[in-house]
């Protein structure tokens, strides 16, 4: 039986009803649950297994029975490890029913169906005597996220110790330690604040208003693969320091709120703009089995891992890869200037039950530092990547070059399409006679209105709908400009909504109006990812346990609920190019409604496994042959087959993950079907050996 659900089509901007099976939401949740990524984390799996073997053997030697509780069992992998390690009884709980049902089948397939009691509940709903016969004396769980406590670990451990565990219970992991490193990074700071927009001569065009300068930003973490941040892009001002410990094993409750004030000294002069954050866990009681989420430069096993992997991987990629536990950036509310090496300052570290926040001050604060929130609309409206994109100087210069060469003072009448288009506002500062700004989003509009007021721009008018434009306004237009950027866009080509808006007014536009961008090209590039492909790759077996039933479940769900192309920030996920990029679609915005059906083949020029296809959009600002007239959402440097691709760091690209071929391939075949009036843009890919 089918049902209909409503969704916004980003290309048409229309709400549409889509026919989906009754179990669509179930398939979507299964496909996006992220269990596969964890199961590809070989270090996590090996060390959990080693800790279970060591702990259970130690309990046996002490003459104790071993009764295990596995909270959030997922596939049942940790429960099967506990059985293999010799536990007397194992109880597992899993509240996500599709996963629990799959775990039941996996346990049976691995001969553990009658050895593990599976409870389809949250651990906080379990009652001893009703759901499990006795309290457990060994808890094994994976309740952690990038922030460590963001998935509710504090409350879950507190409840387990109070209700489900014996007084002398052991836990795997036993403890966690959190680390902070204060740094300066002009590049990373672009993800958090708005810079002045200047013309090509460096003269200011738009200044941020005072409310943006005084805003402390959002305290929420910015999770990134920190090892991929170029070493040239930041200055470490301190060594990593331990800020909090979490003892998962102690019977006493873990505090839901704590503060730590550290007096530190700067290693070199700079601005304390941000905090790099990560954690490690001691999986066994003795602290001998350690798993660290540190970036490569702070990883305790860097030398051994570098020697082991040799020249196959760049140094930032020799440490174990995982996408479920990354590192985080926290932005200091007001950057602190440290004018010399050895300068003392105070780092305030805080956590509540689910999150952390930080502050840096020269003097010790006299009272607790409250968690800060956005007061300027910027941080609450736009993603980190969009804020960085607004600040991206090389990109902005290409738009400003077009505007400076195209706008005639007191003569040009400009229509700006898109959300948060400060570059469009810059046309007013460049002398345009009038600027009509299409900005239907309430918070984005409020932010732009504050910028207009602060910069005393007198000739700007805001619009909710392009259809509301009068014929006289349209007839007077000389320019239509966009980046384009729209808040509903996820994939780069979702910003083709620019073309949809143009078609609504096309018949009423003067013939000589200049439209920029005039066209857009989508490129495809076969690549070999070092690691990213694992998020969609089948697991097969893990530590000797057969997980093919899990693979089948995820594959069925992915076929029904996951797009063939998904958005990823590829600068965080290294990949080698296997060929040159190939154009797979060219759209002229003056004729946007034209349908396209294309196909082609890309010859692989470098040996390697094609485990991904990267896609992006190049925006052509004006019809000429200058590379400066192109703004790309893809590689930031020319692509060379066999070499790692350097990607734009302020936008997400599209990625297709092909199935692993049974034999080496020589060509990637592709087809593109674009129906703009329906907002349908579909790609298919096939791998062939010729």
From Swiss-Prot:
Entry keyword set: Methyltransferase, Repeat, S-adenosyl-L-methionine, Transferase
Keyword Secreted annotated: no
Name the UniProt record assigns to this protein: Protein arginine N-methyltransferase 7
PROSITE patterns found in the cross-reference section: SAM_MT_PRMT (PS51678)
Family classification: Belongs to the class I-like SAM-binding methyltransferase superfamily. Protein arginine N-methyltransferase family. PRMT7 subfamily.
UniProt domain SAM-dependent MTase PRMT-type: residue ranges: 14-357, 366-690
Assigned EC number: 2.1.1.-
Matches recorded under CDD domains: AdoMet_MTases
GO molecular function, one term: protein-arginine omega-N symmetric methyltransferase activity
InterPro entries, A to Z: Arg_MeTrfase, MeTrfase_PRMT7, PRMT_dom, SAM-dependent_MTases_sf
Described function: Essential arginine methyltransferase that can both catalyze the formation of omega-N monomethylarginine (MMA) and symmetrical dimethylarginine (sDMA). Specifically mediates the symmetrical dimethylation of arginine residues in the small nuclear ribonucleoproteins SmD1 and SmD3.
GO BP annotations, alphabetical order: peptidyl-arginine methylation
